[in-house]
């Protein structure tokens, strides 16, 4: 299983250790998204930055859409299925399946590891970006509902 992690809050007033963890996750700016494997190390990092990001389990269909719509190659070149097939030797669906199952990491592919997203259409949840998802906000763990948020942000 793989997590999609999206940075929600900015950099003003962030403690140094949390800023370092966000940097290690490659979440330098708001509305940036990374795909990480579900390991104990990453779970600990997510718990540390839970007040600045939201995360959940991404499904295959959403990852395919994310790669095709927001994936970039070095030099900020757009991605299409033919380029993916040429560079990796597999189609986009197969690549997404292997990333989700943890067989390969996104950084082992020619794609850039960070996806730059739009702010969500119709905004975040009613509670805003200062409250956890569990009480109606946008922060923290949200499980399968991360796919709905990613659809709104693509």
Swiss-Prot record:
CDD domains membership: Ribosomal_L7_archeal_euk
Signal sequence interval, chain numbering: none
Keywords in alphabetical order: Ribonucleoprotein, Ribosomal protein
GO BP annotations listed: maturation of LSU-rRNA from tricistronic rRNA transcript (SSU-rRNA, 5.8S rRNA, LSU-rRNA); translation
GO terms for cellular component: cytosolic large ribosomal subunit
Keyword Flavoprotein: no
Subunit (UniProt): Part of the 50S ribosomal subunit.
Family assignment from sequence similarity: Belongs to the universal ribosomal protein uL30 family.
UniProt-recorded name of the protein: Large ribosomal subunit protein uL30
UniProt source species: Methanocaldococcus jannaschii (strain ATCC 43067 / DSM 2661 / JAL-1 / JCM 10045 / NBRC 100440) (Methanococcus jannaschii)
């Amino acid at each position: 299983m793989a997590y999609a992690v999206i940075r929600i809050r900015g950099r003003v007033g962030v403690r140094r250790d949390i800023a370092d963890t966000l940097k290690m996750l490659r979440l330098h700016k708001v509305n940036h998204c990374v795909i990480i494997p579900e390991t104990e190390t990453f779970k600990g990092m997510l718990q540390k930055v839970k007040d600045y990001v939201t995360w959940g389990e991404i499904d295959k269909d959403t990852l395919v859409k994310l790669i095709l719509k927001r994936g970039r190659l070095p030099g900020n070149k757009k991605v299409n299925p033919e380029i993916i097939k040429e560079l990796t030797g597999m189609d986009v669906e197969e690549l997404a399946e292997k990333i989700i199952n943890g067989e390969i990491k996104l950084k082992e592919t020619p794609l850039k590891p960070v996806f730059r997203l739009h702010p969500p259409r119709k905004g975040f949840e009613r509670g805003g970006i200062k409250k956890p998802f569990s009480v109606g906000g946008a922060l923290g763990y949200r499980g399968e509902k991360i796919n709905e948020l990613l659809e709104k942000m693509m």
